[in-house]
Amino acid sequence: MSDVSSSVACVVVDYHAGAALTGCIDSLHANRVTNIVVVENGLAGSTPPALGARDVVLVEPGQNLGYGRGVNRGAAATGPAEYLLVANPDLVIHDGAVAAMVAYLETHHDVAVVGPQIQRPDGSIYPSHRVFPNLWLAGAHALLESPWPQNPATRIYRSPRSDGTVDWVSGACFLIRRSVFEEIGGFDERYFMFAEEMALCWQVREHGYTVAGVQEAVVTHIGGLSRQRAPRVMIIAHHKSALRFEMQTAKGLRRLLLPVATLVLGLRLFMALTVRPKAPIEEV
């Protein structure tokens, strides 16, 4: 297996994560990842200044680029590497997780993107390996998940295939072949935040590659640190990205029903802003 320290470059997009970012960098170093670039998407000087002493390259664009554009900027600043690891700043990568993902890619040559098992701080599993949603499936899942956790829509949405492949993995942490990342042009920068990982995995699959989850690789995601600063902005961005993905991928009857889907999503956004504007946001 390739040596992690020479084969993996990592990009972390920071938005006021504070001490959590330091913990993330420590866990990367524990996994022998040393080629690390942090992109400061928050206010100038908001990223902990001690990162320089940890051999981390800091990219300071002077503005919030959005997540996908930030990763693209960071990837361009990394040193040579066969694989690109994308990680949220509020993430702790368990020992051996990066090596497990590298090993999977080296033994599954048709797979271009892998995601780890993501745990919440309480140890519960976050469903980070999913099928591509449409507004109808995602809507049914969002409405039924709380009162009926095992409803058909949620089971379909969160079920990996028997061979371990999935449609997409969470953007909180994933490993992608650098050559494929460059082949598809990186993240679609029209997505400011939310659904950008779905769009990336869609492009990966459109180019003939597959996506998979690696249960042996485990990370813990604190979650929500960036979103707590501007919940209303995040809610709006979430819905805009969901609509963009539907417009990008809908075919046949789904495309004919786009006006209806747009209306439904608009009503859902209105309710989210007026009824529960401070509710936590998870990917639908």
Q: Residue spans of the language-model regions?
A:
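A short, conserved alpha-helix in the catalytic core of glycosyltransferases
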Residues: 161-162, 167-218
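Glycine-rich, basic loop-to-helix element that forms the pyrophosphate-binding segment
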Residues: 60-79
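Conserved donor NDP-sugar-binding/catalytic core segment of glycosyltransferases
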Residues: 92-127
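Active-site-adjacent helix/loop segment of glycosyltransferases
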Residues: 202-279
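Short beta-strand-to-loop acidic/aromatic patch adjacent to the donor-nucleotide binding site
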Residues: 81-92
